[in-house]
A protein has these predicted regions:
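Hydrophobic face of amphipathic alpha-helices that form TPR/SEL1-like repeat modules
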Residues: 1-4, 33-40, 65-74, 100-107, ...
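Short helix-capping/linker turns of helical repeat alpha-solenoids
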Residues: 2-6, 24-27, 40-42, 60-63, ...
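Structural signature of tandem alpha-helical TPR/SEL1-like repeats
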Residues: 9-18, 45-54, 76-86, 112-122, ...
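Canonical positions in the second alpha-helix
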Residues: 21-22, 57-58, 89-90, 125-126
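Alpha-helical linker/edge segments of TPR/alpha-solenoid repeat scaffolds
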Residues: 43, 142-160
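TPR/TPR-like (Sel1-like) alpha-helical repeat modules
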Residues: 58-60, 117-132, 139, 153-157
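Low-complexity, charge- and small-residue-enriched intrinsically disordered regions
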Residues: 159-173
């Protein structure tokens, strides 16, 4: 309540200190709240190491698992396999987790190849759980594939034109 200032005068430092004390004593709710605060970087400066530390203290909760998955998609902490694992653990009770898995499998990631069938499975689960965005992805999945193909071809042409330009420049120096 010190953080929100709802029933007490707002004192963010005191609120963070109390949450830290509770989290360090094993309070999973405090761990989750503190982890999210450090992950979001709105109340305090973003600190992904602290976010990870506190979220891991409460990792059995599906909301914490979702937050951990989002953490592992951050550039500084990027580990796609951990993100997929935590989204998967959270997906039974969190339709946003299954939606995110659908996106990851549809668009692919650094060490994870695209898998349209997996994407459809996750989007279907998410849509069946009430996620309208997942339903929109299912309704338009071929459009996204065509856009991906067009972007890939365009990127190849850009790379090819750079190679041709470099070769031309080297030949005409």
């Amino acid at each position: 309540e010190y953080i929100s200032g709802e029933h007490l005068e707002q004192d963010i430092e005191k609120g963070i200190a109390l949450l830290t004390e509770c989290a360090d004593s094993g309070d999973v709710i405090a761990s989750y709240r503190l982890g999210k605060i450090y992950l979001q970087g709105e109340i305090m400066f973003q600190n992904l190491d602290k976010a990870e530390r506190y979220l891991l203290l409460a990792e059995d909760n599906e909301y914490v698992q979702y937050a951990l998955a989002k953490l592992y998609l951050q550039e500084e902490k990027y580990e796609i396999q951990k993100a997929v694992n935590y989204f998967g653990r959270s997906a039974d009770k969190n339709h946003w987790a299954s939606y995110q898995l659908g996106r990851i499998y549809l668009f692919g990631a650094a060490e994870l190849t695209k898998d349209k069938e997996q994407a459809i499975e996750w989007f279907t689960k998410s849509a069946n759980d009430g996620n309208e965005y997942a339903q929109a992805m299912l309704d338009n999945i071929s459009k996204f594939e065509n856009d991906l193909l067009a972007n890939t071809i365009f990127s190849l042409f850009v790379s090819l034109s750079r190679c041709i330009q470099d070769s031309y420049d080297n030949d005409h120096k």
